[in-house]
Amino acid sequence: MRTATQRRPRRDRTKRLTNKRMNDAVYAERRKVMHHVYEARDLLRSVGIDMPRVQIRICERDPHILGVARLGGDLAIWISESVINMGERHLRHTVFHELAHTLFQAPHKRGCPLMRPFHPCRPDLKQGERVFLELAKAYHS
């Protein structure tokens, strides 16, 4: 139990990445991420699954971490600025990967095109969509 002087820990932070302050440039980066979140939402709707609200955070560049997802409770993903600058194909792959973690509690899997722990050189978007839908159907069945 907390006393009156203890604060509830902030839930919009992660130990691994530092959130960027919102300004016009960060807002534009966030819109790019949101575009892919909406794509995932529409993809799930096409098979009759409603996607809950997911918080999106843009973080400082990190050479080793492209994204982080919160599992359970408040749904949130953190996307590193470095993956946003890699291009749309890599950004979409990373967003779908992190959404699969936070929405379906999907673990990393070496042979899986979407859920492998290392980022592929050239992600296959159609294969990623197929795996994303398979994970969604398995989670909701």
Where are these regions (language model features)?
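Surface-exposed, interaction-prone regions with an acidic/low-complexity signature
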Residues: R13
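Active-site recognition of the HExxH zinc-binding catalytic motif
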Residues: H93-Q105
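Metalloprotease/metallohydrolase-associated module, dominated by Zn2+-dependent proteases
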Residues: R2-T5, R10, T18-N19, N23-S82, ...
